[in-house]
Amino acid sequence: MDAGLNMADRTPPARPRPVEIAAPDTLLLVFSQAPDEDCARRIADALVAERLAACVNITPGMQSVYRWQGEVRRDTEVGLVIKTSASRFAELAGRLKALHPYEVPEIVAVRPDAALPAYVSWAVAQVRKPLV
């Protein structure tokens, strides 16, 4: 009898994972673009100040190629990666749309498959609505 197998189903014991899987509704990464760094900073400052984002990464110099109004366009934009919680996404998306100069801004949210639990806890705490 092999001590490393569960004899009921003959599967090896579960191995510990180096990074804990984040709960599906805890943390969201929201991707957007801004036309320039000043606009990106204004958006980031507002979202963090209003507790809609825990953190916003600003990445200048991104090249975007896309189709808009029947034409293929190429623009240099500033990338935004916004960290928020699933419970704050609707408010964040509405505010981002209001702050954004584009007619149809990119607002795409994804749930990470894995994240450092301490980071998830910190990020979610930053966007939690304060008790009144």
Regions found by a protein language model. Name each.
Residues M1-V132:
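Positively charged, small/polar-rich N-terminal and surface patches that mediate targeting and assembly
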